[in-house]
Design a protein with these regions (language model features):
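Asp-based, Mg2+/Mn2+-dependent phosphohydrolase catalytic module
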Residues: 1-31, 93-113, 122-153, 157-222
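Substrate-recognition element of Asp-dependent hydrolases with the DxDx(T/V) motif
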Residues: 62, 66-99, 111-124, 164
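Active-site neighborhood of HAD-like aspartate-dependent phosphohydrolases
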Residues: 3-77
Length: 222
């Protein structure tokens, strides 16, 4: 059973900590890099407000990504907007069932140490956790001793990358899965307007192919 912690009394946020994972605690106590992932369209196929565990299907190569992170002792953290909760399409219990199935499919021996979720919709206040707010990532960094400057964020939407950029993550990766195809031009235009001092250009990949995993491994080892 997944451990859960309600971070706010209004239940707009939920965090799952995987305490049993060997990578949960930093052995040295020092800051360490992590891989931050969006969920829908990156880890699992985006099926438009998924609420049933039977509909969970991993994106291509996701297990290989987790295996790579595990072999390099790099923790993985998922950050996800779940506006279907505030819209009334499903509740937190439904979300947890989907989460349990996702973790099961990733397999038990993986590097996932936490999942941060926000249940608010597009009209969420600016101080909420909803991406593009950096607050989910910043909370993860504080609680799990993550060095954001050496971390990676992988997303299919511009909001994922802005969330990472505004939290201090330098390595941004955009995938074509999920909403990636429709978002890519928007992302290219956004970062073309920024100077090199403001942000590094994102790395663009199609999916978690063997070639893409080599790129991710090179970033981690650099």
């Amino acid at each position: 059973m997944i451990s859960k912690l309600n971070e706010l009394s209004n239940t707009s946020n939920l965090v799952n900590f995987f305490y049993s994972n060997r990578l949960f605690f930093s052995e040295s106590g020092n800051l360490r890099p992590a891989i931050f992932l969006d969920r829908d369209g990156v880890v699992i196929k985006d099926k438009h407000f998924i609420s049933l565990s039977k509909d969970v299907e991993l994106e291509f190569g996701v297990n290989n990504l987790f295996s790579l992170a595990n072999s390099l002792n790099i923790p993985v953290i998922i950050i996800t907007n779940q506006s279907g909760i505030s819209r009334g399409f499903f509740n937190w219990d439904d979300y947890l069932k989907v989460t349990e199935e996702m973790v099961k499919q990733i397999n038990i021996d993986n590097s996932l140490i936490a999942i941060f979720a926000n249940g608010l919709g597009p009209d969420a206040p600016l101080h909420s956790w909803r991406k593009p707010s950096p607050l989910m990532i910043q909370n993860a960094s504080f609680n799990l001793k993550i060095d954001l400057s050496k971390s990676i964020i992988i997303g299919d939407r511009l909001t994922d990358l802005i969330s990472g950029l505004d939290s201090g993550i330098m390595n941004l990766i955009h995938v074509k899965t999920g909403h990636g195809i429709s978002e890519r031009k928007k992302i290219e235009n956004y970062f073309d307007k920024l100077s090199e001092e403001e942000a590094k250009k994102p790395i663009f990949i199609n999916n978690f192919s063997e070639e893409s995993l080599k790129i991710i491994e090179k970033i981690i080892k650099s």
